[in-house]
């Protein structure tokens, strides 16, 4: 149960900003089905999940925040508050170098306030050099041990689900190698860039 010291009638939404690695773009994923496991919603009622892809050349635009508020069925003051919330959420996502920023549930109260009740944030390890204060919050027990070991050795390593290992010199070569593996019917087991070491 969540305590909210205001009007008790609420509508719950789901919203997250994350990096779509296949598209190479940030995307806002949102749904009217907040307060529940979004994977369950995706499996049983995928039509209730919306995606708004953000063009990195121009960033989040006003028409996109309005589209999100409209798709959530909001109007009046709640519509305005949601557009402001979406813009602020995206600004925070970029500002802290996150790779995922999830709000679930996101409340709309009967007095048209938008309230983030719970949040999960995943920081992009490649942006940590801009935020030295984040290191104190890092919990390496929550990370893949192989990735932690590679990081401590100064290597850029990402574990994947495939069966073919990739060790390359440079991110561009890594991406091309992974594409060739996929085209040949395999799946990359990792991304290991040893460039500069």
Q: What residues fall within each predicted segment?
A:
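ATP-dependent carboxylate/acyl-activation modules
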Residues: 1-103, 107-197
